[in-house]
């Protein structure tokens, strides 16, 4: 016990000495930090209070010399960076070679050479900076750090709320992209499974879609409501998502004559459209009878589309246009039922049903397919033409499709419109016609007032 007591006393003395040394080191570090801060504040005040000469008041020759000195300064800074990076890259290359023996003399020479170059660049930077100090702020990284920190905290870049919002936006974007990708995979897998489980749906007998049947029902209903004695025609373009106002030709029995295109006329129509436009048209998927199932149409550098045909049950030599699907130039599709991933082409595909209904009821003695192809050719300036109504290219279409270029073309002269702008145009035309008719009735020279 007597031997252990002096040892304990020595240990306590050592611990106390270590604690005192640690406290002294902390005090010294704190004092050094305070001195550095005071020096930085003094330098910053000197920079603020330092008068800066106006460069534009100097002669042109002196201005040129000043610019050359700035170029020399930037050149020396780039040399320092390149020398340092080359020196460390040499270490990396030596490590990749996995050399067991290191040549110390060679490493010393490399280090000495790089240090000489760096010191030479620093000395030249000091010389040039002294020359241009009266025309610019003093170049020193320590000063810039304080200015940068004060600016960053004043602008709120490092605010926790801003960082939280940025993280939420990034997570939301990632979730949306993943959802879109997985939903597209799920839809393609579902379509493939349906083809395997229900092949009858995709056979030739089922090609006439429900849309063509609905058009036939609508045409039969309108024929019953019309009389055989009065036929009214209008020159105003039809409103969106409604059947055209111009009724088709009536037979003596009071029923509407169906308008079909013949398979024998397809080659002639394609040849005519190729002469009038730059569309590239190809027949796709020959049927057992030799007739095509549709057409593949491409407008160079703008879009491509699929035109799907339907065959009436009573007329096997004729066809109707059931559906038109628009796609981007670089989009791929492996089915006649595919749809585009771009909102603008989805919107034009929706508007194509209106075009099919209009031209099917108003062929004007020509081919329905030719009218449809001419309407498709009118979208060649899809991303360049302005809307006739708002005089803009992009316009808010809907929350689903967001901002789109003009996706609607009038059926008589192919004027580009946004759908909402076209509806406003129709309303203004109707209000103008009603106002003119009322003014004519109120006029003292009107025959109604005589």
UniProtKB/Swiss-Prot annotation:
Its main location: nucleus. It is found in: Nucleus. GO terms for biological process: regulation of transcription by RNA polymerase II; transcription initiation at RNA polymerase II promoter. Residues 15-118 form a coiled coil. One of its GO terms (molecular function) is transcription coactivator activity. The keyword Nucleotidyltransferase does not apply. The keyword Amino-acid biosynthesis does not apply. GO terms for cellular component: mediator complex. Keywords: Activator, Coiled coil, Nucleus, Transcription, Transcription regulation. It holds the Pfam family Med27. It comes from the Eukaryota. Component of the Mediator complex. Component of the Mediator complex, a coactivator involved in the regulated transcription of nearly all RNA polymerase II-dependent genes. Mediator functions as a bridge to convey information from gene-specific regulatory proteins to the basal RNA polymerase II transcription machinery. Mediator is recruited to promoters by direct interactions with regulatory proteins and serves as a scaffold for the assembly of a functional preinitiation complex with RNA polymerase II and the general transcription factors. Belongs to the Mediator complex subunit 27 family. This is Putative mediator of RNA polymerase II transcription subunit 27. The gene is med27.
């Amino acid at each position: 016990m007597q031997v252990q007591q002096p040892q304990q006393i020595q240990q306590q003395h050592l611990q106390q000495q270590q604690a005192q040394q640690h406290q002294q080191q902390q005090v010294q570090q704190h004092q050094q930090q305070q001195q550095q801060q005071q020096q930085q504040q003094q330098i910053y005040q000197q920079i603020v209070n330092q008068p800066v000469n106006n460069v534009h008041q100097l002669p042109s020759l002196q201005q040129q010399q000043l610019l050359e000195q700035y170029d020399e300064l930037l050149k020396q800074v780039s040399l320092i960076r390149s020398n340092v990076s080359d020196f460390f890259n040499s270490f990396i290359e030596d490590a990749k070679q996995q050399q067991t023996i290191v040549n110390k003399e060679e490493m010393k020479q490399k280090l000495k050479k790089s240090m000489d170059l760096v010191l030479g660049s620093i000395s030249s930077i000091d010389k040039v900076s002294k020359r241009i100090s009266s025309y610019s702020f003093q170049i020193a990284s320590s000063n810039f750090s304080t200015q940068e920190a004060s600016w960053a905290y004043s602008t709120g870049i490092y605010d926790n709320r801003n960082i939280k919002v940025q993280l939420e936006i990034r997570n939301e974007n990632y979730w949306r992209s993943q959802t879109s990708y997985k939903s597209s995979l799920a839809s393609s897998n579902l379509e493939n499974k349906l083809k395997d489980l229900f092949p009858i749906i995709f056979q030739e007998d089922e090609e006439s879609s429900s849309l063509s049947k609905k058009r036939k029902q609508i045409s039969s209903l309108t024929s019953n409501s019309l009389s055989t004695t009065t036929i009214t025609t209008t020159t105003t373009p039809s409103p969106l998502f409604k059947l055209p106002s111009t009724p088709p030709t009536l037979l003596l029995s009071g029923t509407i004559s169906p308008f079909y295109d013949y398979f024998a006329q397809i080659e002639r129509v394609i040849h005519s459209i190729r002469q009038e436009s730059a569309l590239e048209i190809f027949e796709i998927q020959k049927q057992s009878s030799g007739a095509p199932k549709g057409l593949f149409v491409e407008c160079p550098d703008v879009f491509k589309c699929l035109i799907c045909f339907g065959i009436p049950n009573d007329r096997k030599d004729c066809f109707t246009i059931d559906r038109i699907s628009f796609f981007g130039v670089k989009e791929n599709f492996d089915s006649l039922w595919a749809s585009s991933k771009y909102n603008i082409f989805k919107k034009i595909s929706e508007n194509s049903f209106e075009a099919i209904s209009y031209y099917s009821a108003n062929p004007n003695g020509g081919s329905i397919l030719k009218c449809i192809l001419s309407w498709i050719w009118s979208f060649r300036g899809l991303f360049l033409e302005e809307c006739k109504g708002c005089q803009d290219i992009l316009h808010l279409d809907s929350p689903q499709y967001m901002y789109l270029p003009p996706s609607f073309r009038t059926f008589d002269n192919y004027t580009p419109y946004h759908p909402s702008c076209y509806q406003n145009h129709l309303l203004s035309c109707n209000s103008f016609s009603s106002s003119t008719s009322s003014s004519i009735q109120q006029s003292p020279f009107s025959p109604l007032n005589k």
